[in-house]
UniProtKB/Swiss-Prot annotation:
Its cofactor is [4Fe-4S] cluster. The gene is nuoB. Belongs to the complex I 20 kDa subunit family. It is found in: Cell inner membrane. [4Fe-4S] cluster binds at C72, C73, C137, C167. This is NADH-quinone oxidoreductase subunit B. It comes from the Bacteria.
Amino acid sequence: MGVIVPGNSSPVPALSAGRSTVEGYDPKLHDPFFDGVSQQLADKGFITAAADDLITWARTGSLMWMTFGLACCAVEMMQASMPRYDLERYGFAPRASPRQSDVMIVAGTLTNKMAPALRKVYDQMPEPRYVISMGSCANGGGYYYYSYSVVRGCDRVVPVDIYVPGCPPTAEALVYGVLQLQKKIRRTGTIER
């Protein structure tokens, strides 16, 4: 694998289709809070900030997610954690326990029999907690919409913050959904939801 060096950018791996990140997003370049903090530190030598702004900023860079992989979307979710997409570079690290997680990714077909388990796992997560619904089946039943055993959207069981469409959605779509969740947390805050 070679490296491509664009004229005004950093080195990009040759197999990444000319992109160093998804949609050209770099959290350190486009984060207004980070820009304000670094400017204030350069001017005064110290930082003053509201505690909830600081907590919100820290929380967006350290989201812990747990998987609730139910079908083929879980394969794409696993791919998003691998080195090519590397969700951990955005501060989005996996956890095995719901008690240590901030985000739950529901990926795949939710059946009536599995719905109580989904709700139980959601209730075990500490506040503030967020849910990403990944794929057509989790969003609204998808291909199995008319089946007697399928819940037509996981939002009937738990509140969903971000919907990632597709059947199955690509790993890039999930990374984009994670970035949208981080923007939503910055916009709404985390102390009171």
